[in-house]
């Protein structure tokens, strides 16, 4: 009987160890290290796929964006980049023409609209702003606020280091996402928490609250965070005036809930693409609400829209600039598909005598630019 019991114990131990070993092999993807950042700032990307016939690396750091990976005798596909500038980079794999997948050897994954991407950060001047550093950290909350349409909407709110333990009041930046995005967009791909922590710690930005509402009126929250069930994000917009119409309720709720300085000179609004359009429309429709406005690669309607909120553009801009904003900042990349619309909009501002600041970068309609714009814009806020 004792021998039989020992046999069962031995068998259970063997099964447990074998199961654990199998799980470890699965988790470790055959010991593949990917991504591997090298001393010269190049990166090696690897994928264990011994049965694959071809693997294409889709990324923003290889010439042309797509590159065929090379298979080793061990079934590991590999690509080594050239030396990379300090930045955040994204990548995915396409195996034998199938749908793209993230790197199974890396847990660093972000979502942009409905696409999942693996990422890494090359350290240095810019990359260090996008990564956690040894500084005092702020807090990030996801909250629900009741809007003027009677529905609750989800928002992400960043509060600076020391907010919870103090009594001080803070200025507020309302930061808006683009088409297909949600309240998570600026957190994941935009790196807003890391950027604000680091800029504030370096004394380059004033301590401030950052509010990121869900600007897609078709949904009240990011996927998986509402009673709407499982839906797939797509490039649906909210450019019908409804988001702008409810925005005073957003500001009112924030002022009632957080220790804010409820004055226009202590409020800023900015956004990317559709969010830039929203920021432009909200700031002109409520001219006494914001003294700082940032348009990042902003979408600009041409001609009549048929939406009352968007009509009388010249008349409302004149009224807005009668009390000139402390900063009206427009930024766009020279390769952005919205570049011409922004040229036309600046020509209109020039014609009306509206004072603004313009910043032009290289590149197109991409997060790489929008992170830079946020870094630059945040450093100019609440200092006049």
Regions found by a protein language model. Give the residues of each.
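Non-catalytic cap/lid and distal C-terminal segments of serine-dependent acyl enzymes
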Residues: 25, 37-66, 71-384
């Amino acid at each position: 009987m004792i021998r039989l019991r020992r046999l069962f114990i031995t068998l259970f131990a063997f099964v447990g160890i074998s199961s654990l070993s199998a799980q470890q092999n699965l988790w470790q993807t055959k010991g593949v290290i990917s991504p591997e950042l090298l001393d010269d700032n190049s990166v090696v990307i690897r994928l264990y796929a011994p049965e694959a016939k071809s693997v294409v690396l889709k990324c923003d750091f290889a010439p042309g964006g797509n590159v065929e990976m090379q298979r080793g005798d061990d079934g590991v596909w590999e690509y080594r980049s050239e030396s990379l500038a300090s930045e955040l980079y994204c990548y995915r794999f396409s195996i034998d023409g199938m749908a793209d997948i993230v790197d199974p050897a890396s847990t660093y994954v972000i979502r942009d609209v409905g696409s999942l991407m693996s990422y890494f950060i090359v350290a240095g001047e810019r990359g260090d702003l996008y990564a956690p550093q040894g500084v005092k950290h702020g807090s990030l909350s996801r909250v629900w606020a009741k809007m003027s349409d009677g529905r609750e909407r989800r928002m992400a709110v960043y509060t600076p280091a020391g907010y919870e333990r103090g009594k001080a009041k803070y200025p507020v930046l309302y930061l808006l996402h683009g088409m297909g995005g949600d309240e998570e967009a600026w957190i994941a791909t935009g790196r807003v928490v890391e950027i604000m922590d680091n800029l504030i710690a370096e004394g380059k930005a004033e301590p401030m609250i950052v509010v990121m509402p869900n600007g897609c009126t078709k949904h009240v929250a990011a996927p998986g965070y509402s009673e709407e069930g499982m839906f797939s994000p797509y490039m649906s917009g909210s450019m019908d005036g409804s988001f702008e119409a409810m925005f005073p309720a957003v500001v009112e709720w924030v002022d009632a809930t957080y220790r804010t300085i409820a004055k226009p000179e202590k409020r800023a609004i900015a956004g990317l693409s559709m969010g830039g359009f929203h920021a432009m429309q909200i700031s002109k429709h409520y001219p006494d609400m914001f003294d700082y406005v940032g348009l990042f690669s902003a979408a600009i309607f041409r001609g009549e829209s048929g939406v009352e909120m968007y009509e009388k553009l010249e008349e409302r801009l004149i009224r807005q600039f009668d009390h000139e904003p402390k900063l009206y900042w427009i930024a766009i990349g020279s390769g952005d598909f919205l570049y011409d619309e922004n040229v036309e909009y600046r020509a209109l501002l020039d014609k009306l005598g509206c004072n603004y600041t313009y910043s032009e970068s290289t590149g197109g309609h991409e997060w790489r630019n929008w992170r830079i714009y946020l870094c630059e814009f945040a450093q100019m806020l609440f200092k006049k």
